[in-house]
Amino acid sequence: MKATTQLRELLKGDDIIITPGVYDCLTARLAETVGFSAVKLLGNVTCGSLLGLPDLGLIGLNEMANHAKNVAAAVDIPVMVDADTGYSGGPLGIARTIKEFGRAGVAGIGMEDQVTPKKCALIPGGTPVVPIKEQVRKLQAAVEAREDPDFVISARTDAESVNGLDDALNRIKAYEEAGVDMVGVAMSWVRKEGMRQRTLDALQRIRDAVKVPLNCMFMDEAIQVGNVTLDEIKQLGFKMGGSNAVRYTVVKAVTEMLTILKNEGSTKNYSHRLASLKEYEALVRLPEFLEMEMRYSA
């Protein structure tokens, strides 16, 4: 089954699709190995891992599409891609973006309505957005440009951080009418403590605003800081939710290991936390390739 069709089938199911935010083939393989049904290739950490740069619109379409192609080929589960603002200021460029990602073999993309150059929505200070009509034209071009009807197009609005939730709700309604398959609202205030009721109320209003499947943006943050539960998010009818924890885990764990290596000259005192060579070889499917080599060399 095509990755696009797999994702469509998942969206028809009763459960929420939790998509860990991966950044390369290995993290995608790890997610698949432990049983996730789909992953999200994040722009933020891909920009950091490929270029060593922050998420400020510094990665381009070709870099992201080429990287996405490798990640999609490395796993047998659907890969959604964070396509930022679409890497173009107009509908013609957006159409090319959709075609490039479609040819890369990913299951779908998410596009946000920030101005260009964009910045990560988790950066304090708000994220300016383009006018609704401009974003609607982009999304209409995206929907029209897909060559595979199962290719999923998700639209996210960042308007809440600058214009409030009412404008964000108006936007996702307009994006739904433009023909996208899923919508989400980035909520800036989930970083604040004691926001449980406000978070729940906002999630309910988002659910009531549209009929298409909903992506719970920054779900980990909503649970940890907004103090809502995964069950509550499920009960509200959200179909997808992401986690940014992969990148934070890697930064923390690798820093700890490197510090021990630098200070002690070996990783002996960290070895209990290291994967074995056999585990790594299984992750990259070495036994499978060796068996294939044996068959063809016989």
Predicted segment positions?
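Extended, intrinsically disordered, low-complexity segments
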Residues: 7, 244-298
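Alpha/beta enzyme core
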Residues: 1-216, 224-241, 289-298
